[in-house]
């Protein structure tokens, strides 16, 4: 910054400049040892630190003093080359030089100073200050120093030089700590406060010798003093950033005191920036600091959410046992239940425990989730959606197709004369019926008197139909078991297998104290019947998901490693998935070793690729969220030859970093997609394009398709006056072939690029910025990627935006539904269902109706459209399958695992959903939960409270108390809360026991408010 020219100065400015120039001239003519130097320096310091003038411009004193900076440095150098004695004048001069360096600009530098400088010259501001502090400390340690000087030195504070100076000093401190050599020395130093209080016995100068080991403790003390000032004056975000850079994040705890609002702002900021930690260790340190601050402040609900995010069982126990308020303790149990964390707490020894055995039983009961069904029916009653819906209500505006010809429901039961044309048509109605009525316990298709709908299916269709009974009775274990019981005694093995799966589905996210599943299913896992074993495996997978039950290893591991002659690949794959769901995120060694061994034994070809992908998915689920701890498994997978080995590697890596927002991992997945080895050959690409064009034109001859054969049989039966269609028509098998061409069996629509695309979405999950960038990231694969990459993009978007119908995502998927690639369009249709699952989104509903009109002759696409419609209307618009909760802070691993199984199967849905593995659609069950806010009194009785629900507004890092919602509407609880919405109470009569109003919220009467 150039000093103002004399021609541009007013008379007052000229006089002021002359006064300052005279003071500097007198100082230079004297020596620092002289008594006259001290008052001159005090006057200069007063002028420099005097505030005045416009806040947008530099004070005039600094504008006039800056040109004397070189002269002041020469004065100090002359002193040091002379006696070099410490004095109060030296301290003032060094501080003044440091202050002038803070406002210096490149224009102020001389030609010599503009040359490449030494490392020390980059930190003059910091070095001058360190030199001044060291000189002052030596004077205080010297007994000969006068008391008056001691008092003056002790009274000087770092904040005396103003905010701008502190900001400049903190910037240089951060730059100093970012030097590699500084980090090396810092890591080798002992982390104790004693090292900061050591006074050098001999005189040292950091200006003459750039001593990193000496500078580190001094700059750390500066950081502590600066952040103390920042916290006291409302600059807590700057203070947190500085402490993070100098690795002193733990010191935040003692700087906040008991200020409730300050703790709220600080912890919210720490939690939000923890996602951007360079390493998992750094992220964990930040979260632990926030946890300890909240726990010390008695904010148990917020501390519990951090403990759940850390996945630390001990911290969860500490929060529970440390909570003395009974209502808050019940609220903590409800939070754990919504997270899928069952609290199997034992009594804590010692006097510190305040919980009685009755309290522990109550906590265990609430966290088991057995309350969910009853409260959900209260929600349904209040919203007037308790009446069951039929699939025909969903398809009312759909055109008549081969899949719904002659389908009628009258008076709540099936017509005796109804004719069913295909297994796919029946199966689509079964899934839609189950999704729409899930959790309500009643429907108009299966659970009605004299209904034989379950038997209008074939093989795995029978299994899915029987299993759907459990989905209808979701969360209600007792009612579910009673309704499923009659199917267990069927003579058809597929129906019996479906009943076993239904037992588990009805127990999803519920841990009943009696554990009826162990008696019903465990002995079935050892049955020689492969179909029954598959059903039992599915039931165990659903019923024990996330329970970490070790006793199940001895049942499931032998099925996983078994030969194909013992169990088909589908059964072994589902056993592996069951292990993954039960031990999700634990990295259980026995389960991981079994799956890796199975992958090693599988042949290197593209046959049975859907099952191989499920093995890879199961292994990834075991490593969900384990980050660097999964490296051992990834290294072991390098020994697996073939495409399925590379798929497993990428799947494990994607799951290990799920929800981390790790940009480096996303770049690695993009690099995998761009690698030359994953680019399809031109011949294969052309063949894929030909296949896509061919599938869009279905065969016209009834002999070319099992569906047309079934339709012809139905028509003939009706023309001849046949009445018992069940005897005259055999339903078509799920997974019919459109032609006899086996060339497509040699090629797989799934490769490692497909998994890499899913990995990008998994990594970005939960990060709002990362998810928003997905649309941009996927533009390149859609435009230039291989067919496998393009086909995975819609599913990746659906995975990141499950039950979150963002307009931008809906627009992108709507365009892809008309893609020239048959598989891309089919995947986009299914993705629309996942994105809108449980929301009744009108835009998606209209889009699916239009698509149904466009694909009336394509039975496979029509089936997918109906599945998407069923997902869209899931729970009559009261549920969600998003794995995120607590305003996006927490990730339900069990929900994400189940969703990932379905999405992995969807990569090749023609060979899974419509062929050999339609039951993979049922794996959305662990992800289903109500999207609600329901209020209870401390005695757990339901109470209606006025509340506001609006769009979520991010207030972290903002000044003041901003509104946390916008565009809100006022309702009475219970209310529905969307993915991007937030709720808050609209009355002061009640006080919630948690700050996040989501799920089940306990409210207490506010005794400080008098109602009129």
Annotate the PLM regions.
Residues 2-996, 1001-1002:
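Extended alpha-helical assembly domains of large eukaryotic scaffold proteins
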Residues 1010-1011:
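Long mid-to-C-terminal assembly/interaction modules of large eukaryotic proteins
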């Amino acid at each position: 910054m150039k000093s103002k020219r004399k021609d541009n100065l007013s008379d007052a400015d000229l006089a002021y400049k002359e006064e300052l120039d005279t003071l500097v001239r007198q100082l230079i003519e004297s020596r620092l040892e002289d008594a006259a130097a001290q008052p001159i320096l005090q006057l200069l310091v007063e002028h420099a630190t005097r505030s005045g003038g416009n806040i947008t411009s530099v004070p005039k004193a600094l504008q006039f003093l800056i040109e004397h900076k070189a002269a002041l440095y020469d004065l100090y150098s002359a002193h040091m080359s002379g006696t070099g004695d410490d004095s109060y004048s030296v301290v003032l001069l060094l501080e003044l030089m440091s202050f002038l360096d803070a406002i210096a600009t490149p224009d102020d530098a001389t030609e010599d100073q503009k040359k490449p400088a030494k490392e020390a010259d980059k930190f003059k501001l910091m070095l001058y200050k360190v030199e001044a502090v060291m000189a002052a400390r030596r004077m205080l340690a010297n007994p000969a120093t006068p008391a008056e000087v001691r008092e003056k030195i002790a009274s000087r504070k770092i904040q005396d030089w103003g905010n701008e100076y502190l900001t400049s000093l903190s910037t240089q401190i951060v730059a100093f700590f970012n030097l590699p050599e500084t980090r090396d020395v810092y890591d080798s130093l002992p982390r104790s406060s004693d090292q900061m209080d050591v006074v050098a016995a001999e005189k040292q100068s950091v200006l003459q010798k750039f001593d990193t080991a000496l500078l580190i403790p001094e700059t750390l003390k500066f950081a502590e003093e600066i952040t103390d000032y920042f916290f006291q004056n409302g600059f807590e975000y700057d203070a947190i950033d500085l402490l993070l850079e100098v690795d002193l994040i733990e010191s935040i705890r003692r700087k906040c005191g008991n200020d409730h609002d300050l703790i709220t702002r600080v912890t919210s900021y720490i939690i939000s920036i923890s996602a951007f930690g360079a390493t998992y260790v750094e992220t964990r340190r930040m979260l632990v600091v926030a946890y300890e601050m909240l726990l010390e402040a008695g904010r148990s609900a917020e501390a519990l959410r951090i403990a759940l995010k850390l996945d630390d069982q001990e911290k969860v126990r500490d929060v529970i046992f440390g909570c003395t308020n009974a209502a808050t303790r019940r609220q903590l149990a409800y939070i754990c239940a919504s997270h899928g964390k069952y609290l199997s707490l034992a009594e804590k020894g010692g006097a510190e425990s305040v919980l009685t055995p009755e309290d522990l039983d109550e906590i265990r009961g609430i966290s088991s989730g057995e309350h969910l069904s009853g409260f959900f029916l209260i929600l349904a009653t209040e919203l007037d959606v308790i009446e069951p819906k039929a699939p025909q209500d969903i398809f009312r505006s759909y055109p008549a197709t081969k899949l719904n010809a002659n389908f009628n429901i009258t008076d709540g039961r099936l017509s005796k004369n109804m004719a069913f044309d295909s297994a796919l048509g029946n199966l689509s109605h079964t899934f839609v019926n189950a999704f729409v009525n899930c959790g309500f316990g009643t429907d108009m298709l299966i659970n009605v008197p004299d209904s034989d709908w379950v038997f209008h299916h074939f093989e795995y269709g029978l299994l899915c139909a029987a299993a759907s009974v459990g989905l209808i009775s979701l969360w209600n274990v007792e009612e579910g078991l009673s309704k499923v019981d009659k199917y267990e005694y069927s003579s058809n093995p597929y129906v019996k297998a479906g009943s076993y799966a239904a037992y588990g589905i009805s127990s999803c996210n519920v841990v009943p104290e009696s554990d009826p599943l162990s008696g019903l299913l465990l002995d079935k896992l050892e049955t020689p019947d492969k179909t029954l074993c598959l059903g039992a495996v599915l039931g165990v997978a659903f019923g024990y998901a996330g329970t970490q039950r070790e006793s199940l290893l001895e049942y499931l591991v032998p099925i996983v490693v078994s030969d194909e002659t013992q169990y088909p690949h589908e059964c072994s794959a589902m056993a592996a998935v069951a292990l993954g769901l039960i031990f999700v995120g634990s990295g259980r060694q026995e389960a991981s070793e079994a799956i890796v061994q199975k992958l090693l034994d599988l042949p290197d070809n593209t046959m049975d690729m859907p099952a191989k992908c499920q093995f890879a998915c199961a292994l990834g689920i075991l490593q969900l969220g384990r980050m660097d701890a999964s490296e051992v498994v990834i290294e072991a997978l390098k020994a697996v030859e073939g495409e399925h080995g590379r798929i497993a590697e990428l799947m494990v890596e994607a799951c290990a970093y799920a929800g981390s927002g790790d940009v480096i991992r996303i770049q690695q997945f993009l690099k995998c997609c761009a690698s030359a080895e994953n680019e399809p050959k031109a011949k294969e690409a052309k063949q894929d394009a030909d296949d896509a064009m061919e599938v869009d034109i279905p065969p016209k001859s009834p002999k070319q398709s099992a569906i047309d054969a079934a339709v012809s049989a139905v028509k003939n039966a009706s023309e001849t006056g046949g009445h018992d269609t069940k005897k005259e028509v055999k339903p078509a098998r799920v997974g019919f072939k459109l032609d006899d061409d086996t060339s497509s069996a040699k090629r797989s629509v799934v490769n490692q690029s497909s998994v890499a695309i899913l990995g990008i979405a998994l990594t970005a999950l939960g990060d709002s910025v990362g998810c928003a960038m997905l649309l941009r990231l996927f533009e390149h694969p859609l435009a230039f990627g291989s067919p496998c990459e393009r086909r995975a993009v819609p599913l990746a978007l659906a995975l990141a935006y499950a039950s979150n119908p963002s307009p931008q995502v809906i627009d992108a998927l709507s365009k892809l539904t008309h893609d020239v690639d048959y598989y891309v369009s089919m995947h986009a249709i299914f993705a629309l269902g996942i994105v809108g699952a449980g929301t009744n989104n009108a835009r998606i509903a209209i889009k699916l109706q239009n698509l149904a009109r466009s694909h009336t002759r394509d039975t496979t696409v029509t089936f997918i459209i109906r599945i998407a419609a069923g997902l869209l209307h899931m729970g009559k618009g009261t549920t969600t399958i998003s794995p995120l909760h607590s305003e996006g802070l927490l990730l339900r691993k069990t929900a994400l695992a189940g969703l990932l199984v379905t999405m992995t199967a969807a990569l090749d849905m023609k060979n899974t959903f419509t062929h050999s593995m339609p039951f993979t659609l049922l794996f959305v069950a662990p992800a289903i939960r109500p999207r609600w806010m329901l209020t209870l009194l401390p005695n757990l009785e339901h109470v209606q409270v006025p509340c506001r629900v609006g769009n979520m507004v991010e207030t972290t890092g903002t000044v003041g108390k901003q509104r946390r919602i916008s565009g809100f509407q006022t309702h009475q609880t219970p209310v529905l809360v969307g993915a991007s919405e937030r709720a808050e109470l609209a009355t002061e009569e009640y006080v919630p026991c948690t700050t996040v109003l989501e799920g089940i919220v306990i409210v207490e009467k506010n005794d400080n408010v008098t109602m009129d």
